[in-house]
Amino acid sequence: MQETLQNYIPEQAIEGVLQLLANENVIVKIKQERKTRHGDYKKLPSGKHQITINSNLNQYRFLITLIHEIAHLKAYKNYGRFIKPHGVEWKRTFQHLMLPYIHPSIFTDDLLPLLANHFKNPKASSDTDIKLALALKQFDAPNGKTYIFEVPLGSRFKMYNGREFKKGGKRVKRYECVEIDTGKVYLFNPNAEVDLLD
């Protein structure tokens, strides 16, 4: 597993991650990109645990996602299966597991304060923390996409699934966008990546 992980996470984090996974009956699978999630955890019928992580994540997002999923495993083992997936038990576990990694030998100086702030009260997805999500995306390979907040008001754009929208105004933190085919209004996070059509 060490050989595999060293291709995906910062070198200084490998030993700690391997210790977290030691003595756990867990399979870690690296998958092709899934648009709706960075990773997931589940207990298999065989009694083993499985963690899957998208292969296209940059090393920092991969590490955060891996620790996020390990926190699900540890919370399940420590508190049972009736806890909320991103409830208090998981949050405390995630904070505790992530703390040793919020270090300048692992993350860049510009990410550290954003991570420290995020982990005061971690959310189900780091993408909902707009500042952290944008800072992490700077380490992604270029993909030619445009962020919603960069799309001019009234312009049309297309999502990864082919659905087309017209950008409307901002409502508190998210943007109202109208689906062209149905006229339905959807809210988009500012850091959603889209293809600009006009």
Cite the ranges covered by each PLM segment:
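Metalloprotease/metallohydrolase-associated module, dominated by Zn2+-dependent proteases
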Residues: 3-6, 11-44, 50, 56, ...
